[in-house]
Amino acid sequence: QIYPGGNFEYHLLPFKEAIKNNLKVIMPYYGIPVGQTDEDVAMAFNSYILKDLLREELNYDGVICSDWGIITGRHWGVDELSIEQRYEKSIKAGIDQYGGEKDTDYLIDLVKDGQITEVRINESVRRILLNKFELGLFDNPYVNEELVQYKVNTQDNIEAGLEAQRKSIVLLENNGILPLKKGSKIFVDGLSEEEAREFGELVKDPDDADAVIMYIHTVFNGNQESGLNRAFDNFLSTLFPNGDLNFNKEINKKIEAYSNEKKLIVVVDLNRPAILKSIKESSSGLIGTFGVQDRIIFEGLFGEFNPSGKLPFEIPSSMESVLNQKEDLPDDSANPTYEFGYGISY
């Protein structure tokens, strides 16, 4: 993690507010805060980050739980240390609890050998048990199943969730095609045909449609290398997208084919930013969503509600502009396609 814009302090603001509001657990990230402390090691091994900053400067006394696999997997900056040494360094830095690690023999040996004191172990035990006591887990650890139906999946909660989905939808472009009229002939690619039939007449040929509606998932160009020969890490590398925000050639070719008659509406899932410049130019309507249900998308397309969402981040115009921006500054890429907070309505 680097801070070419000098914004290390800016990134502390949410942590400060959370700690003020009685935060119980913090998980240090895998990354190395390059050039910010007296040694370039990952957060979980970094005494300045965990002790000097969190404990002393910010007065945090909750649990510090490591991210998953910092001892046997993602131990950035301390690769040369043995497993036992990584445990020792992370405990002395301030870790209370380990995510994804389960071999306690190393901890026991460190205490027996006098490298870690029981007093230090008890500090972490106190913090961990305090959270459990405050939750009442030792007084009544069981759930009253009879109350579940009144607490979980209630109609009020369902309606609130659906309304939140509606409010999240961002209308990015509308060249007079939206909202669609109920009963319009539509060709659908990537969305539920069953849901589509409730709003329009489904056709099999895009040439016969009044509108072509194409849904695109979050941009995901291949798998990032895990760099480790561990099944869990290799599995994770199939879940998370790499850094390229361009859609692949297959998707772009399909968009180009659909856009010939100027009646294409693209719905793109924006769980992360994407390069949308060419899609904007090829479509008559462009909508950004954030994991909403297909039915909610159709409700918006057919005017059952007026989109009011705003972008929570900017949409860059190219990968070149992304690579040239400062990593610790938000929304500073050159000539973004859409700025932070952008969103229009019908």
Predicted regions mapped to residue ranges:
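Second-shell residues forming the walls of enzyme active-site clefts
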Residues: 1-100, 104-109, 117-120, 127
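Aromatic-residue hotspot detector
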Residues: 15, 60, 138, 203-206
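Short coil/turn connectors at secondary-structure junctions
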Residues: 21-24, 59-61, 93, 125, ...
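Intrinsically disordered or highly flexible coil/loop and linker segments, enriched in small
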Residues: 24, 96, 116, 134-138, ...
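C-terminal non-catalytic regions of proteins with extracellular/luminal or membrane-system context
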Residues: 29, 40, 74-75, 105-116, ...
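Flexible hinge/switch segments at interdomain interfaces of large molecular machines
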Residues: 138-147, 217
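Short glycine/proline- and acidic residue-enriched helix-loop micro-motifs
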Residues: 147-156
